[in-house]
Swiss-Prot record:
The lineage of its organism: Bacteria, Pseudomonadati, Campylobacterota, Epsilonproteobacteria, Campylobacterales. GO terms for molecular function: ribosome binding; rRNA binding; translation initiation factor activity. The keyword Protein biosynthesis applies. This is Translation initiation factor IF-1. SMART domains: S1. One of its GO terms (cellular component) is cytosol.
Length: 72
């Protein structure tokens, strides 16, 4: 998949689920299931409920995403 195909959108973490999955409410009020990107997992960046995050979505599946950045 080319990097140009992703949709980036901001959201808020609602709930932490097992296996580093999270429920995230996007700015457009949709709730999706997300996992942490590999670089964030490698650097032990912790995600807690209430955190503002940047999420990447693919055009193929708009109900699953990848958390790529946690805002401070």
């Amino acid at each position: 998949m080319a990097k140009d195909d992703v949709i980036e959108i901001d959201g808020t973490v609602l709930e932490a689920l097992p296996n580093a999955n999270f429920k995230v409410e996007l700015d457009n009020k949709h709730v999706i299931l997300c996992h942490i990107a590999g670089k964030m997992r490698m650097h032990y960046i912790r995600i807690m409920p209430g955190d503002k995050v940047k999420v990447e979505l693919t055009p193929y599946s708009l109900d699953k995403g990848r958390i790529t950045f946690r805002y401070k």
